[in-house]
Each structure stands twice: as C-alpha cells, then as structure tokens.
C-alpha cells in the first residue's frame, strides 16, 4: 500500500504556503488569486513556479522556497488524527507500506522521521533534488522498483487528482481521502473507474479492511 504524504498523512499546508509566499516576496512577484492551498499543495513545486510566468525569476523563487521550507516550513506540520494508529494496524495485518510523494525525498524522510512514522514504511520515495524525478508517475515508478517482487495487489492512498493519474499509469487503483487538499479536484464526487473515496479515517479503515 502506497501513501501520499502532504494532505494524506500530514497536514502540511501552513508551512508550504508560508514558504511559497516568502519565495514570491523574495522576487517581488504578486500572490496569485484564488485558493492558494488548492493550487500549490500536492503538485511539484518546481512546476508550480515555472507555470506562473515568472521568467528568469522562476529558478530564484524555487531556490528561495526550498531554503525557507528546509529551514522552517517543513516543521509547520501535523499528523492527521488516526494516521499513526492506522499504520500500526496495517503493519500488524501484514501489509507492506510505502510513501510516494512529489516532495523532495530527503525532506520527506526528515518529516516522517520527525513524526516517528519512518519506521512503518518499507520504502520512502520522493522527488530527486536534481529534478530528474518529480512527477507522481515517476515517483511511483521509483517506489515500485524498490518494492519488487510486488504483492498481488497494490493500492494508492492520496488526496489529489495527480495521485489518481500517477497510480492509474501503473495500473493501480486509488483511495482518495477527504481530509486533504484535493476537494476541487473531485467537485462532484462522481464515481470513477479505479477510484474510491473515503471522507474520514473510519471510512478509510473500512475500505482497507482494518
């Protein structure tokens, strides 16, 4: 079973948004309109900045974000209620666990270790610092290669549409949790092939059978 990190295991929006705003202030760029959390928490941050038409300032914004997030933003974070107990019960049931996140892998490892969750995961896969691996489909490929031989069934648990699309590219179904940052990705909650919705941790437990 492969878990996303931001918006699935941890409530990380505060630190990500604060670091994002710091980066924009650093280069003198305006804050985009609309729901900032929905726009930036989940997708690769490099892609977010490069899509903002910042020109030559995009790379400087990325560097400023990484510096601020590495210094302070990563710790502005909290576990969602019930997550640790769920992981304990899944492991007790013999389920192999992994993390696949678009966050930089060293940062993901730091966060999971901070919360004492790293012990539960056989594999922690994230984006590479050199940018060669960042899209969800790439991060999932990195995770799956380390899990071989794969079990008969692999399941993704995430909160955003890119979790669903990345998993589907590998033939993996996704459980979309309702406490994350992807509500705008699934506006009508309409059934979709290979996708199950779990609004609460109790619903997720029922879906996973633990």
Predicted regions and their residues:
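Helix-loop "lid/cap" segments that line or gate small-molecule binding pockets
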Residues: 23, 43-56, 111, 143-144
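Active-site neighborhood of HAD-like aspartate-dependent phosphohydrolases
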Residues: 1-38, 55
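Metal-dependent phosphoesterase signature
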Residues: 50-84
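Conserved Lys-Pro-Asp/Glu-containing loop-to-beta segment of HAD-superfamily phosphomonoesterases
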Residues: 134-164
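Conserved H-loop
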Residues: 30, 55, 117-122, 150
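A short, structured active-site edge motif that brings together acidic residues
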Residues: 36, 118-133
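Short, acidic loop-to-helix structural element flanking the phosphoryl-transfer center
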Residues: 71-99, 105-109, 137
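Acidic, Mg2+-coordinating phosphoryl-transfer loop and its flanking beta/alpha structural elements
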Residues: 156-196
């Amino acid at each position: 079973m492969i878990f996303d990190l931001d918006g699935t295991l941890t409530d990380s929006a505060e630190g990500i948004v604060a670091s994002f705003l710091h980066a924009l202030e650093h280069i003198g760029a305006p804050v985009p309109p609309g729901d900032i959390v929905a726009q930036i928490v989940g997708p690769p941050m490099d892609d977010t900045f490069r899509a903002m038409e910042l020109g030559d300032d995009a790379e400087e914004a990325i560097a400023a974000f990484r510096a601020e997030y590495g210094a302070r933003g990563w710790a502005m974070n909290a576990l969602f209620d019930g997550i640790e107990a769920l992981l304990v019960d899944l492991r007790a049931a013999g389920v192999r666990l992994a993390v696949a996140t678009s966050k930089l892998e060293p940062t993901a490892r730091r966060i999971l270790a901070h919360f004492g969750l790293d012990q539960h995961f056989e594999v922690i896969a994230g984006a590479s610092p050199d940018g060669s691996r960042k899209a969800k489909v790439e991060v999932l490929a990195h995770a799956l290669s380390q899990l071989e031989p794969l079990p008969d069934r692999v399941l993704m648990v995430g909160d955003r549409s890119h979790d669903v699309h990345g998993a589907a590219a590998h033939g993996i179904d996704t459980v979309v949790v309702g406490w994350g940052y992807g509500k705008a990705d699934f506006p009508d909650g309409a059934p979709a092939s290979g996708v199950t919705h779990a609004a609460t941790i109790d619903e997720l437990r029922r879906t996973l059978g633990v």
